[in-house]
Amino acid sequence: MSRDALGFGVVRTHRSVFSLVRDMTAATQIVKAAAGLHISVRNFDRAERFLAQAVSEPPFLVILDLEKCEVEAFRVLNELHKNADLKNVPAVGFVTQAKGMVKPEAEKAGCFRVYMKTEFGRELPDLISRYAV
């Protein structure tokens, strides 16, 4: 338990953030932001591992690297929506401006929100605490 970044009070969750991220800078940002809230992060580099773990230990938030894991991220979105226990888990993603055309496709596939990479880094602590509450 810890105080959340938005001042909502104590964050009470024993579930983790699951991320499918290959960008090491972004993965580090996610871990640091979650650690500040005393929330654990499970980072995966393959959709198969991600999905196997999500079925046994549902996360409270999914973060997807839509730039470096585009195909696998769409596979994760598809599988999340097929599974009754996981279909309500919020998924967010991030892309660079160069791959911005992926944003509407990801939102149509079930991503709650797709951030530009620079915005994602700025919003990360608030984003995690918002979904943890």
Predicted features along the sequence, with ranges:
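Acidic, metal-coordinating helix/loop segments flanking the phosphotransfer/catalytic sites
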Residues: 46-61, 71
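Conserved phosphotransfer cores of two-component systems
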Residues: 81-87, 109
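A short, hydrophobic beta-strand element within the central beta-sheet of small alpha/beta folds
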Residues: 88-98
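Conserved phosphotransfer microenvironments
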Residues: 64-80
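Non-catalytic signal-transmission and effector/linker regions of two-component phosphorelay proteins
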Residues: 1-16, 31, 127-133
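Conserved acidic segment of CheY-like receiver
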Residues: 14-24
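Two-component/phosphorelay signaling modules centered on CheY-like receiver
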Residues: 24-42
